[in-house]
Curated annotation (Swiss-Prot):
Propeptide: 18-40
The protein's name: Omega-lycotoxin-Am1d
Organism: Alopecosa marikovskyi (Wolf spider)
Tissue expression per record: Expressed by the venom gland.
Domain of life where this protein originates: Eukaryota
Signal peptide feature range: 1-17
Additional remark text: According to the nomenclature proposed by King and colleagues (2008), 'Gsp(267)' comes from the species name 'Geolycosa sp (strain A267TDLS2-KZARNA)'. This species has been reclassified since that study, as indicated in the work of Oparin and colleagues (2016).
Lineage of producing organism: Eukaryota, Metazoa, Ecdysozoa, Arthropoda, Chelicerata
């Protein structure tokens, strides 16, 4: 009899405390997620030489836009630049 009362109280305690543990885990995920997103954004917003191998879909939902530019101004040498852009 005492054992069954113990188990009933034990399961009630587990059921009562468990949502607190889940809430704590969700809070931790929410705290670390913006840091991870911010790091990803910094690594994605860089100049590229090509739109190939777009790591982890960095440009999504944007698109990777490439163009050629002359480097330095009096030279005929052209350099290809690519960047993630909304338009």
């Amino acid at each position: 009899m005492k054992l069954s009362i113990f188990f009933v109280l034990f399961f009630i305690a587990i059921a009562y405390c468990q949502p607190e543990f889940l809430d704590d885990e969700e809070d931790e995920v929410e705290e670390t997620l913006p840091v991870a997103e911010e790091g990803r954004e910094k690594s994605c917003i860089t100049w590229r030489n090509s739109c190939m191998h777009n790591d982890k879909g960095c440009c999504f939902p944007w698109s990777c836009v490439c163009w050629s530019q002359t480097v330095p101004r009096n030279s005929s040498r052209k350099e290809k630049k690519c960047q993630c852009r909304l338009w």
